[in-house]
């Protein structure tokens, strides 16, 4: 349901009071989230949703894994993949969408969801 409020022509009153779990709440008061939301609004004129925060996190998670894995321009694609897999299955990552995120060998991420409610046509942290 995250993103439903931005569907063109959607009557947001239909979702009023809807509760959902999401990895990201744009109105969370921590400094990291507020800095991201502010920069996103300035760049795109809209409030970011879960998918924007996920994209932001994945760039920095890959960067962290690449640095820790010693990835460089002399490596071939197979070596890069092996290094990334090794790092992702052994590291933790603190991002906008979760603290202490981990990944298993299949690539599935483990992170705690946040509860939000749709109130007055916007997502609100619970």
Placement of each model-derived feature along the sequence:
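Extracytosolic ligand-binding ectodomains
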Residues: 1-126
């Amino acid at each position: 349901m995250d993103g439903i409020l931005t569907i063109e022509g959607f009557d947001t009153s239909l979702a009023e009071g809807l509760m959902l779990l999401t990895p990201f709440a744009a109105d969370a008061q921590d400094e990291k989230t507020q800095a991201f939301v502010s920069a996103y609004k300035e760049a795109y004129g809209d409030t970011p949703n879960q998918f924007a925060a996920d994209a932001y996190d994945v760039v920095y998670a890959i960067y962290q894994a690449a640095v820790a894995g010693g990835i460089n321009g002399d490596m071939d694609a197979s070596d890069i993949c092996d290094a990334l897999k090794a790092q992702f299955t052994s590291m933790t990552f603190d991002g906008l969408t979760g603290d202490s995120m981990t990944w298993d060998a299949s690539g599935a991420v483990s992170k705690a969801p946040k509860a939000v409610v749709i109130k007055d046509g916007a997502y609100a942290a619970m």
